[in-house]
UniProtKB/Swiss-Prot annotation:
GO biological process: blood coagulation; blood coagulation, intrinsic pathway; cell adhesion; megakaryocyte development; positive regulation of platelet activation; release of sequestered calcium ion into cytosol
Lineage, opening ranks: Eukaryota, Metazoa, Chordata, Craniata, Vertebrata
Topological domain ranges for the Cytoplasmic compartment: 173-206
Quaternary state and interactors: Two GP-Ib beta are disulfide-linked to one GP-Ib alpha. GP-IX is complexed with the GP-Ib heterodimer via a non covalent linkage. Interacts with TRAF4.
UniProt protein name: Platelet glycoprotein Ib beta chain
Length: 206
């Protein structure tokens, strides 16, 4: 997956996450202290993981849960995030981990994430997640299973393309209306001033 699909996917999921974040700020069953959100050792799985976290989160603790993957865009939706504690989870290294792998690749330091190891599939068991290639993650998907990460990226690009086309159409329509109004105003002003100019010309000739 190239950088453009990831960028479009991240943008779309960022908007969705901001729209769906909990009104209370600190999502259950986590605890919060300032901008630190602690969801560690709460038995969280993909299904029970909070859909979003406060956008000003600077430190997120997900250590010691039952997470095999993270929803795409979950970490990208936290622009202030400086540290994510993700150890002691049974990560399944297949195409579902592509968003997390991309997020890790963008971190300035990989040392804090060297304890992230693949538990499955057998071919990748024990491997350090930050050093598993994207092609290896894609290849780990079951035969015939479309990598939903790539599918979401394509859908995101389609939605963004449609939004851009709609915005362009609205801007062009607005521009046409402004030009039509300016033309009508010019014609109206000319129709008002032309008789005065003609009358002034006749007066000067006499």
């Amino acid at each position: 997956m190239g950088s453009r699909p990831r960028g479009a996917l991240s943008l779309l999921l960022l908007l969705l996450a901001l729209l769906s974040r909990p009104a209370s700020g600190c999502p259950a069953p986590c605890s919060c202290a300032g901008t630190l959100v602690d969801c560690g050792r709460r038995g969280l799985t993909w299904a029970s993981l909070p859909a979003a976290f406060p956008p000003d989160t600077t430190e997120l603790v997900l250590t010691g849960n039952n997470l095999t993957a993270l929803p795409p865009g979950l970490l990208d939706a936290l622009p202030a995030l400086r540290a994510a504690h993700l150890g002691a989870n049974p990560w399944r290294c297949d195409c579902r981990l592509l968003p997390l792998r991309a997020w890790l690749a963008g971190r300035p330091e990989r040392a804090p994430y060297r304890d992230l190891r693949c538990v499955a599939p057998p071919a990748l068991r024990g491997r350090l997640l930050p050093y598993v290639a994207e092609d290896e993650l894609r290849a780990a998907c079951a035969p015939g299973l479309l990598c939903w990460g790539a599918l979401v990226a394509q859908l995101a690009l389609l939605v963004l393309g449609l939004l851009h086309a709609l915005l362009l159409a609205l801007l062009l329509g607005r521009l046409r209306r402004l030009r039509a109004r300016a033309r009508a105003r010019s014609i109206q002003e000319f129709s008002l001033t032309a008789p005065l100019v003609a009358e002034s010309a006749r007066g000067g000739a006499s």
